[in-house]
Structure formats: structure tokens, C-alpha cells
Amino acid sequence: TAFVRGYGRDMELEADGLGAQYLARAGYDPTAMIQVVRVLKNQEDFAREEAARNGQAVQAGGYHGLFDTHPDNDRRLQEVVGPARQLANGQQEVGREVFLRHLEGMPFGDSASAGVRRGQNFYHAELDFTLSYPAGWKILNQPSALLGYPADEQSFIGMKLVPHDSRLTPAEFLRKNAGQRLAQEESLKQAGLNGYTAVVPGNPARRVAVIYQGDRAYLFVGVVKVGSLETQDDRFLSVIRSFRPLRDKERALAQPRRLHLVQVKAGQTLEQLAAGGEGSLSDSVARLRLLNDLYPSGEPRPGDWLKVVR
């Protein structure tokens, strides 16, 4: 509600005022606190627009309870940051160039140790596997499981690494761990790996599978929240059957993307700099703008240094 938002905003504005004071006492420009809020507001706007494009639910509310107010024009934000200007000395350090140099080569997004998402594919160097998800699906990499699900979030397939007894065949493992009768049982043999898949009847029914890779076992569970399993079962099976060891040429894909600095040349466009990014070109351009404080419609000037992800 607006009442709760207002209460929360008072607390956040107090924190912003303190942040501005800390900046001033450390020798930095205290008004940079407003720039920080602007960046966070832009991030929220971008996330909303991205959700709307993908047919996902758009989160209500606004950062700091700002509603539709832009941080640069927000009177109360200016008021809490203003007093910190009295604490600022004459040497208000910015140090943007030094900061940017420290960013060169920094990993961006997924890490090699946790696995890397690239488009509809997932790569894990240490565990030596890859698998693919249907077009339009999201991939969520959690510490305990890897999840894939469509835009409507009404179904999902999860995969996790589980302990297993090497004396059990994949079929025996699945029967032992399913805890009930299996249906539509089928052996899996893919890329030199052995596995087994079946359906666990019930409400809801579940597609389950296990794949052995060396001394590791990967358990898959696919569920449709509302409706029959058949509506997504072919897609669940496509994910399961895509699991395989990495090829040599794919090992580079299992390494994280990194930030790099590029200097804009005369005539060079954001579209050119964003080419080859994830998703559509328009999405890549929007992300590039967001990364460089140009969102939603800013353009770089020749000679500007921009952060790009490669």
C-alpha cells in the first residue's frame, strides 16, 4: 500500500542521507548518492520492461517508493542529500578512470565454479557436462539444483547431483528412490552415458530420470503445476536427452563472460558494440545502455570509454 511504501521510503531516504555524509567525509562528491539511486531506478525500469516483453508478471511498486518520480527531480531525496554538501572539502575525488581500469577483465554474471548459462545452454567445466533447454525457457542456477521453466512458470524441470550406490543400475536407482510404481520406463544411452527415465504416476504426475557420469549421478524431475504432464513431457525429455559431456571446443563456453573496456570511435554505434550479445539486438543494446549509465535512450560520444561484456 501507499502507506507502507511511504514508511519504507522514509527509512531509505535516511540511509541515503547517511550515505551522502559518508561520501563527503571520505572526500567524494556527496551528490553521487543521487546518481546511485538513479542507477537503481534504471535497473528496476529495465527489469520491468524486460518482464513485459517476455510475457512475465511485472512487479508492482518502485524503488524507494519513487513511483514515477525521477531521482534527479525528487525533492525529498535532494533535501536529505543536501546537508552533506557542507561536509565536503574542496577536493572531491571521482577517480572514474582508475575505477574503470580495475574493472577490466572482471568476471560478469555466472562463474565457472557454479556453471555458465549461454542462451538456452548450460555449461559446467569442473563437472564436465552441458545440457540445453527449449527456446524461450529460463534457466535458474541455484546452489542445490539447476531449474528450467517456460515464461508462464507453470512447469519446470529440475536437475541435481545426488549420491548413488555404484552397485545399482540406473533403473534400480530410480525404482529405489521414486518410492512407488513407475510407468513408461525407458533406458537412456547418450554420448557414452547410461541412464534411465520413467513417469511417476500421481497428481501431479512427474517425469523422472537419472544419468550416471563416472562416480556421479544426476537426478531429473519434471512437473506441470496445473494440467497434464503430457503438455510438457516432450520438452522435459529433450532436456534430459541433451545432457552429455563437454566437447573440447565447448570448454571455453564454460568460462565466465568478462567486462572489457572499449573506446567509442567516430561513427560507432551501440548496435555495433552490442552485436553478438545474449538475446535480441534490442535487448543487448538496452543492457549495454544500463551497464554504462545511458539507459534508457542515451548515446555515447566518440572518445567515451564503455564497459562491454565478452
What are these regions (language model features)?
Residues S282-R310:
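Extracellular LysM carbohydrate-binding repeats and other cell-envelope/extracellular binding modules
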Residues P150-L161, R257-A266, L306-V309:
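Short, surface-exposed polybasic-and-hydrophobic patches located at secondary-structure transitions
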Residues D248-G279, D304:
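Primarily a LysM-type cell-wall glycan-binding module
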Residues L87, F220-P256:
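Surface-exposed amphipathic alpha-helical segments
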Residues L13, S132, K265, Y295, ...:
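Residue-level recognition of short, solvent-exposed, well-ordered loop/turn junctions
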Residues T1-G95, L100-E104, F108-Y133, K138, ...:
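A Zn2+-metalloprotease active-site environment signal
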